[in-house]
């Protein structure tokens, strides 16, 4: 081993022992020369294997249950009312459409299904309809775990969703506390942070991640990763910006392939016990290196995203076959 490899191995040992990495140590991972990426991926894969010995990959699917007309001004998002983007706008879909979405998820082979709503926070009426849909999915006996992403939900709404059978709530920090003001002005990073704490307080599993390629620095990426370590979230979706025409970020810099692999590895080193999910932008940003990314992660989103199409599901099944990995099938 040379000097860099020895240093990376020392950080690997810290992760294996669940010792927190410092900000400087996490930055070191992001700043190594590209020639060390294969070694870095190897170590990240070993960390994953240590905490997740089963060679499994989970498929998760979503439904865009309420689309557009959002009151918030997130600069990356097609659904904000502030931007003219080519999307469909509609209110919360009926219960049967949410159930049909779960059926489609099962057909794709998804183990998780997330009901996603645009807007700062779901109304009481919307929460009620979601709980009806969740109960119906359970009554149908569909072999899929149900998650919800509906903004800054209060404790009462979270408890209702939990009672209905929801296992996990998604609410993304999106980026670091420091960079957040550059992408959103209609609410604060603290609003999102406190929502995650409420989710944990009521005993629901937490899913919270971010988007890379919005102009944030490596320090911002590390700060977000270390915040998730502090919060001990269960699942971290990793998204790479898909620039959308009409949004302020339609010409954002994006992320290069080697850079993306380093980001994924850094999240594995800093959050070794968390499920890492490859989500939006994985097709465009990982390209021929999808397999390397999957070695470090636990899950991937299939069947498309909120306003954009996803990868051909046949390619994801072939990827699992090539990696000799099993598709996770486990209903909580």
Swiss-Prot record:
In this protein, which residues make up the domain named Radical SAM core? 52-282
EC number assigned by the record: 2.8.1.6
Which residues bind [4Fe-4S] cluster per the record? 70, 74, 77
The protein's annotated pathway? Cofactor biosynthesis; biotin biosynthesis; biotin from 7,8-diaminononanoate: step 2/2
**Cofactors, names only:** [4Fe-4S] cluster; [2Fe-2S] cluster
Q: Which residues bind [2Fe-2S] cluster?
A: 114, 147, 207, 277
Which Pfam families does the entry mention? BATS, Radical_SAM
Which reaction is catalysed here? (4R,5S)-dethiobiotin + (sulfur carrier)-SH + 2 reduced [2Fe-2S]-[ferredoxin] + 2 S-adenosyl-L-methionine = (sulfur carrier)-H + biotin + 2 5'-deoxyadenosine + 2 L-methionine + 2 oxidized [2Fe-2S]-[ferredoxin]
User: In its UniProt record, which GO terms are filed under biological process?
Assistant: biotin biosynthetic process
Which UniProt keywords are given for this protein, alphabetically ordered? 2Fe-2S, 4Fe-4S, Biotin biosynthesis, Iron, Iron-sulfur, Metal-binding, S-adenosyl-L-methionine, Transferase
GO MF annotation terms? 2 iron, 2 sulfur cluster binding; 4 iron, 4 sulfur cluster binding; biotin synthase activity; iron ion binding
The cross-references to NCBIfam families, in alphabetical order and at most eight, read:
bioB
PANTHER family membership = BIOTIN SYNTHASE (PTHR22976), BIOTIN SYNTHASE, MITOCHONDRIAL (PTHR22976:SF2)
Family of the protein in this entry: Belongs to the radical SAM superfamily. Biotin synthase family.
State the function annotated in the UniProt record.
Catalyzes the conversion of dethiobiotin (DTB) to biotin by the insertion of a sulfur atom into dethiobiotin via a radical-based mechanism.
Instruction: Supply the name of the protein.
Output: Biotin synthase
Tell me the organism: Aquifex aeolicus (strain VF5)
- Gene expressing this chain: bioB
